[in-house]
Amino acid sequence: MKRQSEWIRVESIRGARRISNFFWAFILILGALGFLLVGSSSYLGRDLIPLLPSQQIVFIPQGIVMCFYGIAGISIGFYLGFAISWDIGNGYNLFDKQRGIVRIFRWGFPGENRRICIQFFMKDIQAIGLEIREGFYSRRIIYMRMKGQQKIFLTHISENSTLKEMEEKAANLARFMCVSIEGI
């Protein structure tokens, strides 16, 4: 979502609450539970899951490895679940021409630094850029180049926008901030 007036522009940034993350957390926990139950069945010597016979799985080494994979998968699944519930990465980019500031806000993990807020002056921005990498792990990222050649990324790596949409976003932002554009 984007809101814009003559002086202020606000862009919402989606966090971890995506359908794909819900899907992968569910699949990961379900599969890891299967591994853990089959490994535990091989230790106990009886089937904990009626559909998955475990008599042919020896506890050492296969059962131990399956238990390890199950515990690791459940841990990663819960990590992903907590990231979804805390909505890690959610936030906004605020561009205020009237006050001459740019504010980037994101939610992080709970703790002392849960709120991540970066604020700087517009006069320190040299250009708006677009970094494009095509291939198997393609990525398209809009960034701001600051004085001193530091890049500050404004979009997620996982944002699935077409090249034309990303070029338009970068051009509109550069036009709004009255800076040059690079990388297109």
From Swiss-Prot:
Transmembrane segments: 21-43, 58-80
Top-level taxon: Eukaryota
GO cellular component, one term: photosystem I
BP GO terms, sorted: photosynthesis
Subcellular location per the Swiss-Prot or TrEMBL entry: Plastid, Chloroplast thylakoid membrane
Membrane topology: Multi-pass membrane protein
A Pfam family recorded for this sequence: Ycf4
Keyword Transmembrane appears in the UniProt entry: yes
Key words, A-Z: Chloroplast, Membrane, Photosynthesis, Plastid, Thylakoid, Transmembrane, Transmembrane helix
Record flagged with keyword Amino-acid biosynthesis: no
Job description of the protein: Seems to be required for the assembly of the photosystem I complex.
Family: Belongs to the Ycf4 family.
Protein name: Photosystem I assembly protein Ycf4
Gene name of this polypeptide: ycf4
